[in-house]
Curated annotation (Swiss-Prot):
Membrane topology designation: Single-pass type I membrane protein
Name this polypeptide is given: LEAF RUST 10 DISEASE-RESISTANCE LOCUS RECEPTOR-LIKE PROTEIN KINASE-like 1.4
Stretches with biased composition (Low complexity): 290-304
Top-level taxon: Eukaryota
Source species of the chain: Arabidopsis thaliana
Pfam families named in the record: GUB_WAK_bind, PK_Tyr_Ser-Thr, WAK_assoc
GO CC terms in record: plasma membrane
Membrane spanning residue stretches: 242-262
Length: 663
């Protein structure tokens, strides 16, 4: 039957389409303003949309009207912006106060965006033993003597600690630094020049357009038209072209709206007919008798509420999992009233199927293309994986469902995060042996994924579930990627959770297995410290747990990092094992991904730590400074002794828990 499109509906469609067009383009005409800082291209932030500037150059304004820029995993205060010379003055917040109180880190900026002004120079701070008289020296109360050089030389007794930028005039003719004024100089910041393509931006201004960037990688400058309804500078030909284009666009939109309206009505009728005529039967390529409540989906229908996932319903070889109706999952979850928490791209609810199985049902936040792709991605990855430490996917809803839902086994004991620093931590804290088992099982699951060519990309303690026996179930594969075996990396925009993202992936947009290794290093640090990966209530140098851990280990202060309630202070055996795990975490958290261990090696190291009852555990690391954590029983960090890695079997697995997870 033909249904004419009502005039009110057509007006709404056209209005909604055209109403927002001038708003988006006009946002690029807005300036970022904060205190005494005013900026335009290539920056964005505030009233300027992200597409109006370089994706990495977001300016932020705090309550004190101070402007900041977060780039290369470091925060910088923006003291001055010169749009004429395309330069700006930056200062590190951690250098604005007492020099000796900071956690030493290098000043790093992406060279494709910034270059240090010729008026400034990078100087290196050293630890020298003994102190060399030909270098400027400065003594910090806790750290001890620090030597500074504007022109570093090869001193066998000196080890570089970190680098910072100072004016060239600060370096004397004798190539030494006037260290007495070091703090005041660092507070004034340093100047950098922008390397982004400014000529392309000038070309935009010639055509009365605004500068912006596309969302592809590598980023390219794009000219975006201004919105100016009163602009009379257009030629008659240009105006005629615009008029013709507008009329053509209007005609296309009218036809498209008419087509969509008719199609939606037909789909609604087809869906109603299908739901009434289909019998209740089993649908599972693995077990045809396990759940009598599932629904057989008709493969003869050619219509789809979501065409991008239409083959989920009529291709059992695509899903390989059971297909549930929306109504039975709505009933199982008591109308989605028993919320368990967030699950990456959806909310997770507790439910009980008619056959008695307890399940966790993930409900998509929204039906955007990105969410649908994550929905499909999780099914595609989990359907073919079997491992005792990976969560089991029972099934999903069909294309005729009102909403997209995923159905998993229910893991009753919460997340690892809840047990380490959440609402379960105080009631029954995890003992050290349990934490070590959790580390081994998580590493085993990741090693299995890497063997299968899969990068998880979002390993964190909230995605590590625990059953009643504290056996690990790694979950949430919405961001996971299949990794081609013949490639060294995948170029993709960084995704993941702050505090867990590999800094090299963040800076270079290159993803590989070692990105998971870095995230796992953060998890190891949480296991030994019971601290959150990111905690803004900590000292500003310790907000990021990974940075805090590396600093504490490098400065022989592991006792300030670990959870003393685990027996670190009074049990020598626990102390040695915790130090060995800390050493392994230190290797995983290295900035250079090439020096991080592979997951199969990590599994063997952790098993060696668990099985060692009397020997001191030593962990090797190539070309990393040898640091000892003080004390007679301390183990030297990162020495050259480690069991040789072996290739894990893909079809035989051992678990540190005696009992499998109960459903």
């Amino acid at each position: 039957m033909y249904y004419p499109l009502s005039s009110s509906l057509m007006f709404f469609i056209l209005f909604s389409l055209f109403y927002h067009l001038p708003c988006e383009s006009s946002k690029c005409e807005s300036l970022f303003q904060c205190g005494n800082i005013t900026a335009s291209f290539p920056f964005w932030g505030g009233d300027r949309h992200k597409h109006c500037g370089h994706p990495l150059l977001e300016l932020r304004c705090d309550q004190n009207k101070s402007t900041s820029l977060f780039i290369s995993d470091q925060e910088f205060f923006v003291l001055h912006v010169d749009q004429t010379s395309y330069s700006l003055t930056l200062a590190r917040p951690d250098l604005l106060h007492s020099f000796c109180s900071l956690t030493f880190t290098n000043t790093t900026l992406p060279p494709e965006i910034f270059e240090l002004s010729p008026a400034y120079k990078s100087v290196t701070f050293y630890h020298c033993y003994p102190v060399l008289p030909d270098l400027s020296n400065y003594t910090c109360p806790v750290i001890g003597p620090i030597s500074v050089s504007g022109n570093p030389e090869d001193h066998e007794t000196c080890f570089p600690n970190f680098a910072a930028n100072v004016p060239t005039s600060f370096v004397t003719k004798e190539k030494k630094l006037n260290i007495a004024n070091l703090e005041s100089v660092l507070e004034k910041g340093f100047e950098v020049n922008m390397n982004v393509i400014m000529k392309a931006c000038q070309a935009c201004s010639y055509s009365n357009e605004s500068c912006g960037f596309d969302e592809n990688f590598p980023f390219e400058v794009k000219c975006k038209p201004h919105h100016s309804p009163t602009d009379t500078s257009l030629s008659i030909g240009a105006k005629a072209g615009i008029a013709v284009a507008s009329v053509s666009g209007l005609a296309i939109l009218l036809l498209a709206g008419l087509f969509l309206c008719i199609r939606r009505r037909r789909k609604t009728q087809d869906a109603q007919y299908t739901s009434k005529s289909l019998p209740i039967t089993s649908y599972s390529s693995r077990d045809t008798s396990r759940n009598p409540t599932s629904t057989t989906i008709s493969s003869s229908s050619n219509h789809s509420l979501l065409p991008s996932i239409s083959n989920l319903a009529n291709r059992s070889d695509y899903c390989g999992v059971q297909v549930f109706s929306y109504e039975e999952l709505e009933e199982a979850t008591e109308n989605f009233s028993r919320e368990l928490g967030d699950g990456g791209f959806g909310t997770v609810y507790y439910g009980v199927l008619k056959d008695g199985r307890a399940v966790a049902v993930k409900r998509l936040y929204e039906r955007s293309l990105k969410r649908v792709e994550q929905f499909k991605n999780e099914i595609e990855i989990l359907k073919s994986l079997k491992h005792p430490n990976l969560v089991i996917l029972y099934g999903c809803t069909s294309r005729h469902s009102r909403e997209l839902l995923l159905v998993y086994e229910y893991i009753s004991n919460g997340t690892l995060a809840e047990h380490l620093h959440g609402n379960r931590a105080e009631a029954r804290p995890l003992c050290w042996s349990t934490r070590l088992n959790i580390a081994i099982e998580t590493a085993s699951a990741l090693s299995f994924l890497h063997i299968k060519g899969i990068i998880h990309r979002d390993i964190k303690t909230t995605n590590i579930l625990l059953d009643d026996n504290y056996q690990v179930k790694v979950a949430d594969f919405g961001l996971s990627r299949l990794f081609p075996m013949d490639q060294t990396h995948i170029s993709t925009a960084p995704q993941g959770t702050p505090g867990y993202v590999d800094p090299e992936y963040y800076q270079c947009y290159q993803l590989n297995e070692k990105s998971d290794v870095y995230s796992f290093g953060v998890v190891l640090t949480e296991l030994i410290s019971s601290k959150e990966a990111v905690d803004i209530t900590r000292h500003r140098h310790d907000i990021n747990l990974a940075n805090m851990a590396v600093s504490k280990i490098q400065n022989n202060a592991l006792h300030e990092l670990v959870d003393s309630s685990l027996g670190y202070d009074n049990d020598p055996e626990v102390r040695r094992k915790m130090m060995a795990v800390a050493e392994l975490a230190f290797r995983c958290l290295q900035q250079e991904r090439d020096v991080r261990p592979a997951m199969d090696e990590i599994v063997e190291i952790l098993r060696g730590i668990k099985d060692d009852e009397k020997k001191r555990v030593l962990v090797k690391s190539p070309d990393v400074v040898d640091i000892e954590c003080g004390g007679g029983d301390d183990v030297g960090l990162l020495r050259n002794s480690v069991p040789p890695p072996i290739s894990p079997e893909t079809d035989k697995w051992t678990s540190s828990s005696d009992t499998a997870a109960s459903l």
